[in-house]
């Protein structure tokens, strides 16, 4: 039996592997023959031959790469990505966590933005990001970049990190390529999508469309809440059952035209929309400190019409000079959002009803539009120095209409609110490399003018002028080819969105909520150190960090009579220290183990209306085990959990949770067709999530549960030969803005 000798080497495809193996065999044979001839002094008229062992060149591609400003995960070469959704693949990416209810955090924070192909996309914004990423197959994605240190080039507002989803290949290939994917599960939810890339002469286009339907049966769940009101000693209890079904549509078209080797014109348009139907029914009661009934009523709510449409377009012109690396980019972006909500609340079986109405109809419309103009210029100086500079102007308009028609004697609500923002920004960034060292520093200035007005005369108009200087800096040392260390400092700001600003009052029998038109921007600062090891079989990252803010935008809650009142203010003081770690280990061929974990201590304080402080330790971990099996099968299992006391704002603790999944997939037709079957939490009927309110005018808990056990199948088929993909400008528009309300 011949013995195989394995040598690790880096190749790009099977063709290169075969060519290298052939050359190594020839070279080894020649060297062996020469050596044997030199040792044989008696026979010089012949060459002694020896049969060589087969030399197999294998390739272990590193899926994670660390740069001075970002960490990149190679989705395209992750074998498990062919039959996963983008939401599932996020669990495997360093610094990213997805909890049991599919809420996404980056570096432990929900303050992040999602880009597509290097620029903000209207389809990846809003409050339903998890549904969008669930509908998008990972097979359409090349890589995902976690920009942990957004420098001066990125907007100062709205983000401490950026997820950049790169969906097309930037290499010069040629031809036609496409992909079709289908998915379904046992609850009746299903999805379908396709994309196609073509090239005609110098024109390259990419078109994609995805649709996802979630059945009401999958989202069936319930909740209960019990609270104790400290001052009065009264107690309340509420319970409800609910279900939600929705249909999501995501479309995108991109095109580029290479005028010549120095000039490139690219454009794209995208759209995202969904319709939702929600139904809920339950009961609510309140008792005094002696247990006597104060009031009781049953509640039913439904949403006969909820429509959300998000669309946008982008145009970039890129000019390169004959100096290598010098680039000028001119960009324009349009983003628009339309949202229409019609809902109905009904109350029945009432005893001592606390309000003078038995129901109401809510009709709200929100419109958002944004125009962005940007100029970017990059100029290298020698081999080790580079300057980046740019100018940006943003014009935003928000328009909100809210009408509440009460059934009873309560006064109807009719509010019209307009909000406009203008932002002018300039930045300068300097990058230097010297041997194993690299450093980047930058400064950004932003001027913003905000104006709010009430055409109905219900409130006085207001305006604000803000000036913000935002510095950033990073220093990286590459100890070896596989190890590096980085330290960075960054700042960011948050400006309030229309939901946070809109003063319209929305009431229920026991709650009242309204926005705060006087909100200003908040400032966040962060310091972190990152160690990266990228060895042949082991990838590891350790990142301790500390961040803080003194005027964060937060919700303010208090009790007024028997009503819980909530609004917003620039009053949050936050301190957080933590450790992020990622490990990916390939102990032997065909086996992969990975862990994405974090631990942190956080403290939040709110001084108004009374001093409230919330603090606690918490941790989360995602474990994944992948194993290649005979007959081209691949088995994958994952486990995720959250532990400790994760704080939820200044008043409450988040729920602890766990989640697990088993997947088997196989490729057919020369790896063009991939099919996966999976089981999500097969040994758990439903998962419970308990949120505990421990501070403020009332304490208690909110317990919710949903269905977690289901089975599904996914299939992805690739066709054609890709030889050229859409080229994109190396610089483009990024708007990292707004907390709360309708975004792009």
Q: What annotation goes with each model-predicted range?
A:
Residues 40-79, 99-101, 107-111, 147-149:
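Short, acidic, small-residue-rich periplasmic hinge/interaction motif at the N-terminus
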Residues 54, 86-89, 129-132, 146, ...:
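N-terminal periplasmic accessory domains that precede
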Residues 86, 92, 120-148:
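Short acidic/polar hinge/loop motifs at secondary-structure boundaries
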Residues 87-121:
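Extracytoplasmic beta-strand/coil segments of soluble accessory domains associated
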Residues 164-180, 219, 223, 237, 449-451, 481-526, 546-565, 682-696, ...:
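Surface-exposed extracellular loop regions of Gram-negative outer-membrane beta-barrel proteins
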Residues 361, 370-374, 413-415, 420-423, ...:
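Outer membrane beta-barrel strand-and-loop segments of large Gram-negative receptors
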């Amino acid at each position: 039996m011949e013995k195989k000798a394995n040598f690790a080497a880096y190749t790009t495809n099977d063709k290169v592997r075969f060519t290298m193996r052939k050359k190594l065999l020839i070279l080894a044979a020649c060297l062996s023959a020469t050596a044997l001839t030199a040792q044989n002094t008696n026979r010089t008229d012949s060459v002694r031959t020896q049969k060589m062992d087969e030399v197999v060149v294998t390739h272990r591609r590193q899926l994670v790469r660390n740069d001075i400003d970002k960490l990149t995960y190679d989705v395209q070469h992750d074998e498990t990505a062919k039959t996963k959704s983008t939401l599932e693949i996020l669990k495997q990416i360093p610094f990213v966590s997805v909890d049991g209810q599919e809420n996404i955090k980056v570096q432990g924070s929900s303050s992040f933005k999602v880009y597509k192909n290097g620029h903000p996309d209207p389809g990846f914004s809003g409050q339903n990001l998890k549904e969008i990423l669930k509908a998008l197959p990972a097979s359409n994605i090349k890589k995902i970049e976690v920009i942990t240190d957004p420098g001066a080039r990125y907007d100062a507002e709205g983000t401490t990190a950026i997820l950049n989803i790169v969906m097309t290949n930037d290499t010069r290939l040629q031809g036609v390529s496409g992909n079709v994917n289908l998915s379904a599960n046992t609850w009746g939810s299903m999805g379908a999508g396709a994309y196609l890339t073509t090239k005609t002469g110098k024109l390259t286009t990419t078109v994609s469309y995805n649709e996802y339907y979630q059945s009401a049966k999958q989202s069936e769940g319930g909740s209960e809440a019990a609270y104790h009101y400290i001052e009065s000693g009264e107690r309340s209890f509420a319970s409800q059952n609910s279900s939600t079904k929705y249909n999501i549509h995501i479309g995108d078209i991109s095109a580029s035209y290479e005028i010549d080797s120095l000039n490139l014109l690219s454009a794209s348009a995208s759209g995202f929309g969904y319709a939702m139907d929600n139904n809920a029914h339950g009961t609510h009661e309140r008792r005094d400190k002696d247990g006597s009934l104060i009031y009781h009523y049953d509640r039913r709510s439904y949403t006969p019409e909820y429509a959300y449409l998000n669309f946008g377009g982008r145009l970039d012109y890129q000019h390169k000079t004959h100096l290598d690396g010098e680039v000028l980019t001119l960009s324009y972006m349009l983003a628009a959002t339309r949202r229409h909500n019609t809902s109905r609340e009904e109350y029945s079986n009432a005893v001592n009803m606390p309000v003078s109405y038995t129901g109401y109809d809510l009709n709200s419309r929100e419109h958002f539009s944004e125009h962005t103009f940007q100029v970017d210029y990059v100029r290298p100086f020698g081999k080790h120095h580079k300057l980046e500079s740019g100018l940006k102007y943003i014009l935003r308009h928000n328009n909100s209409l809210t009408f509440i028609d009460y059934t009873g004697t309560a006064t109807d609500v009719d509010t019209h609110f307009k909000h406009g923002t203008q932002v002018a920004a300039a930045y300068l960034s300097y990058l230097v490399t010297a041997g194993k060292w690299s450093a980047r520093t930058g400064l950004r200035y932003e001027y913003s003018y905000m104006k709010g007005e009430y055409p109905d005369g219900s409130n006085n108009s207001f305006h604000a002028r803000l000036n913000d200087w935002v510095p950033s800096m990073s220093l990286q040392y590459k100890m070896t080819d596989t190890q590096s260390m980085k330290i960075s400092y960054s700042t960011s700001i948050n400006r309030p969105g229309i939901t946070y600003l809109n003063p319209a009052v929305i009431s229920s029998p026991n709650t009242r909520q309204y926005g705060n038109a006087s909100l200003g921007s908040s400032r966040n600062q962060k310091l972190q150190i990152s160690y990266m090891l990228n060895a042949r079989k082991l990838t590891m990252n350790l990142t301790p960090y500390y961040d803080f803010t003194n005027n964060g935008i937060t919700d303010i809650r208090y009790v007024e009579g028997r009503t819980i009142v909530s609004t917003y203010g620039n009053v949050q003081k936050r301190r957080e220290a933590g450790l992020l770690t990622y490990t990916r280990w390939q102990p032997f061929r065909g086996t992969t183990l990975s862990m994405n974990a974090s631990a942190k201590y956080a403290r939040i304080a709110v001084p108004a209306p009374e001093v409230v402080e919330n603090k606690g330790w918490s941790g989360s971990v995602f474990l994944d085990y992948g194993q290649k099996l005979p007959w081209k099968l691949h088995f994958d299992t994952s486990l995720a959990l959250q532990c400790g006391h994760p704080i939820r704002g200044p008043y409450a603790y988040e729920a602890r949770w766990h989640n697990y999944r088993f997947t088997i997939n196989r490729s057919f037709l020369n790896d063009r067709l991939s099919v996966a079957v999976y089981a999500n939490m097969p040994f758990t009927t439903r998962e419970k999530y308990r949120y505990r309110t421990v501070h403020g005018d009332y304490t208690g808990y909110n317990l919710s549960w949903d269905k977690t056990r289901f089975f599904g199948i996914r299939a992805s088929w690739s066709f054609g030969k890709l030889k050229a993909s859409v080229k994109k400008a190396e610089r483009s528009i990024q708007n990292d803005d707004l907390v709360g309300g309708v975004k792009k």
